[in-house]
Design a protein with these regions (language model features):
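Conserved Nudix-box catalytic region and its N-terminal flanking loop in Nudix hydrolases
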Residues: 21-61, 157-167
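Conserved N-terminal beta-strand and adjoining loop/helix that marks the start
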Residues: 1-23, 43
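Short, solvent-exposed loop/turn elements at beta->coil junctions and helix N-caps
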Residues: 1, 75-83
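NUDIX/MutT-family hydrolases
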Residues: 95, 104-136, 157-167
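Conserved hydrophobic/aromatic beta-strand scaffold that supports enzyme active sites
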Residues: 14, 24, 91-95, 114
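Short connector loops at helix/strand junctions that flank enzyme active sites
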Residues: 8, 38, 67-69, 86-91
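Active-site-adjacent beta-strand/loop module that shapes the phosphate/pyrophosphate-binding cleft
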Residues: 19, 80-103, 130, 134-140
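A short coil-to-beta-strand element that immediately follows conserved catalytic motifs
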Residues: 66-76
Length: 167
C-alpha cells in the first residue's frame, strides 16, 4: 500500500507592474528551489485564515506591497495530486488588480524579477506552472475555474477542468 501524502493549502498571487510585467520569485528554498514562481505561501490553518487573508498577508510579507482583499480576484482553485511526489496541494490562484510600483528587495526565499508573459515562456519555471498554471492564468484570469491536476513524478501533468464560470 502506498503511504498517504499530506495535504497542504496555499495561495499564489499573480502581481503585475504598470507595464504589465509579472513579478516572479527565483526560489532559494523548496518547493520549487531554483525556479521562478509567483509569490505565495501556505494558509495559517490554525487561526482559520481564509485564502484571501493569506494572499494579503503573503504579499505583504514577501514584497512589502500593501494590498487589501478587494484588490484581489480569485481566478482559479486547483487540487494538485502528488506534487513533486511529496504532498498534495490545494492552491488558490489570485490576480492582484493593483499594480506593484517597484521591484521588491531580495528576501530569504529568493530574489525578484519582472518579466513579460513572453519572457516567462523562456524562464526556468516549475513544469506544473508551464503546463497548467500559466495556461490557466492566460485563459481564465478574469473569470473563475476549478481544476485538478495529477502531478505524479515521471508522468506528464494531467489537468482536468471541473467547473468554470460563464464568460
Amino acid at each position: 500500500m502506498t503511504p498517504a501524502l499530506t495535504y497542504k493549502i496555499a495561495v499564489l498571487v499573480f502581481l503585475e507592474n504598470s507595464a504589465g510585467e509579472h513579478l516572479l520569485l527565483l526560489r532559494a528554498k523548496p518547493p520549487n528551489l531554483g525556479v521562478w514562481s509567483p509569490i505565495g505561501g501556505k494558509l495559517e490553518t490554525g487561526i482559520g485564515e481564509s485564502p484571501f487573508e493569506c494572499a494579503v498577508r503573503e504579499t505583504g510579507e514577501e514584497t512589502g506591497f500593501a494590498i487589501a482583499t478587494d484588490d484581489l480576484h480569485l481566478f482559479a482553485m486547483i487540487a494538485e495530486k502528488a506534487y513533486e511526489g511529496e504532498s498534495h496541494w490545494l492552491m488558490f490562484l489570485f490576480r492582484c488588480r493593483k499594480p506593484i510600483g517597484a521591484l521588491p528587495p531580495d528576501i530569504a526565499e529568493g530574489k525578484f524579477g519582472f518579466f513579460s508573459r513572453d519572457a516567462i515562456r523562456q524562464l526556468a519555471i516549475p513544469e506544473t506552472d508551464r503546463h497548467a498554471l500559466w495556461p490557466i492564468y492566460d485563459q481564465y484570469r478574469d473569470r473563475f475555474v476549478s481544476l485538478r491536476a495529477d502531478c505524479a513524478p515521471g508522468k506528464p501533468v494531467q489537468v482536468t477542468l471541473e467547473e468554470i464560470t460563464p464568460a
